[in-house]
Structure formats: structure tokens, C-alpha cells
A protein has these predicted regions:
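Conserved activation segment of eukaryotic-like protein kinases, specifically the C-terminal portion
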Residues: 68-81
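Conserved catalytic-loop aspartate of Hanks-type protein kinases
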Residues: 93
Length: 169
């Protein structure tokens, strides 16, 4: 992504985030948790429309939080509850969406130069998070990285993105 700095306007970044958020809203309505949401699993076409792909680690939701016997996903984007093999809901995807938003704001790779094992320890054990960027997205990203029950819904994120859009236009 860092090579795209000149080409990726704020308008395009917002469109990508909105598209991913709408896609997440659809799969969550179908009672599916993706569990491996990351920028590499979001395809962008020539019209800058983003689509979520690679549902290999996804799970069907139940009425109670799900539990897996082993961690699954990509550490740099993974929610701490998944890293710790704790019960999880669709809110683990919201954490990952926050990392994608961070990427699109900073145009940097998350946890650059840090091994996946170190990332898992830092996030799951020490509660470390990437540095929150300045600007209108900062609070939204921080909220996506809150405890699962305090993370916003996809609908709330879409609403809050309107405020971000006004701030950057």
C-alpha cells in the first residue's frame, strides 16, 4: 500500500473502507464471522470497488460466542480474543476492520518489522495497539480496537464515516 500514496486520495480510501464495511455488514447479517479480514483479503477493482474474499477461516455464528481450539487468522490484523482462543463474535472482524482503516490512513503495513509471534504477544498479552493516527479516523479506529462488547457495529461505522468524509473533504 505504501507505493500507492500519490494515487490514493481520501475519497478513494473512504470508498474502500465503506465497501469493506458494507460487505462485512452483509456477511454478519448472514451469521458469518470472517476471522481473517485483512487488506490482502479485500480485492479492489478498476472502479475502486472493494470486495471481501477468502472465507477459508470463516465460521457460522450461533446465539452464543464461538470458541475455537486454536488461533486462526493473520496476527497483524487479528483480534486479541482470537489470539487468546477466547470466545468470539462478529466483533472480531470489527477489530480487523480497524487495522485496515489504520492502513488506509497511514498507507503503512501494520507492525512492520515485528515478527507475527511478537505481534501476538504484544496485542494479546500486553494489550499493545498500533499508534492511533491523527485526524478524523483516530477515534473510530480506537473504538474498533476496544473490548469486543464496546466495538461499534458496521452500521455505526458507516454513519461515523460520514463525519470523517466531511472532515477530509
Amino acid at each position: 500500500m505504501s507505493g500507492q500514496k500519490k494515487k490514493l486520495s481520501w475519497r478513494r480510501r473512504l470508498k474502500i473502507i465503506r465497501d469493506i464495511c458494507r460487505g462485512l455488514m452483509c456477511i454478519h447479517r448472514m451469521k458469518i464471522v470472517h476471522r481473517d479480514l485483512k487488506s490482502a483479503n479485500c480485492l479492489v477493482n478498476k472502479h475502486w470497488t472493494a470486495k471481501i474474499c477468502d472465507f477459508g477461516l470463516s465460521r457460522a455464528m450461533t446465539d452464543s460466542p464461538l470458541i475455537e481450539s486454536s488461533a486462526a487468522g493473520t496476527p497483524e490484523w487479528m483480534a486479541p480474543e482470537l489470539m487468546r482462543n477466547e470466545p468470539f463474535t462478529e466483533k472480531c472482524d470489527i477489530f480487523s476492520l480497524g487495522v485496515i482503516m489504520w492502513e488506509l490512513c497511514t498507507l503503512s503495513r501494520p507492525w512492520e518489522g515485528i515478527s507475527p509471534v511478537q505481534v501476538m504477544y504484544a496485542v494479546a498479552t500486553e494489550g499493545s495497539r498500533l499508534e492511533i493516527p491523527e485526524g478524523p479516523f483516530g477515534k473510530l479506529i480506537a473504538d474498533c480496537w476496544a473490548e469486543p462488547e464496546n466495538r461499534p457495529s458496521c452500521q455505526e461505522i458507516l454513519t461515523r464515516l460520514l463525519d470523517c468524509e466531511y472532515a477530509v473533504s
